[in-house]
Amino acid sequence: MTEINYNLPVWDLTEIYTDIKDPKIKTDLKKIKDSSNKFVKKWKGKIKDLNSLDFLKCIETYQKICENLHKIGTHSSLIFATNMEDAEISRYNSSVSDEFTEIFSSLIFFTLELSKVDDVKIQSWMNNNNSSKWKPYLNVLRKRNPYLLD
């Protein structure tokens, strides 16, 4: 028979947050919510009319919001994966998941509007050298367009 090794390695997530009670988590979530709210107010309903510079500002802001949110999400899911029976960790993971869902729900307009931008406009955005790195993302998004809900 194979012997089970219960001394498995443990992730060191202190580079992200010290623990699930780290006050920086709440601070970061507030910053992300504030950034998301500003993003929605500034860009919702306007994506198809952006010039190439505004497109670049918009998509880079969206990227930063997503990166920051995924940092918290990664922390909570990895801690939860290592100890699913701990009630406090479970509550933390559930709370982060709820925040994650709320924020991304407010941002869904971005990918929906972006997927409907016509080819001429996208090409004008891509003519800006700094925007061309987004072409693969836009291509994938546009291929999914028929399957997206309004």
Residue map of PLM features:
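A well-structured
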Residues: 1-150
